[in-house]
Amino acid sequence: MPSFARIDGTNTVTDIFTLDNQDCLDASGNHSSTIGAAICEQKKAGTWIESAEKNKEGLRGNYAGIGHTYMTGVQTLGVASTDIFMPQPPYPSWTGISTISAEWLPPITRPTETDAEVASHKNYNWDESAYQADNAQGWVLTV
């Protein structure tokens, strides 16, 4: 079932509508985002962007959610310029977006656990306070 996100003037998602598949078909029986967006517009005025088509993965990197941001001209998902929906970053310092997947990147690359650390059930977790105190730090090894 296709879903559509309504965005406000700051490109923040404010509403989500899910439509029946047949509601988005053109006269030839092909899926049409334009038709779906027009149906959403009739229900609630605003700018509507398709988030997911039928039962497929999110069309724009992530499924849209309330509070997510719609971004255009982003180099991600293996293409030079695309549009995506992004949740808020998990931490204030995470401002970069992966060029491979539509996800936020930390300012410092996550270290890889050694075999001994894995065997001891240790892993690296982000510590925003540590990063804010010293921008060369951020990943903390925890149990």
Where are these regions (language model features)?
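Interaction-interface detector
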Residues: 1-143
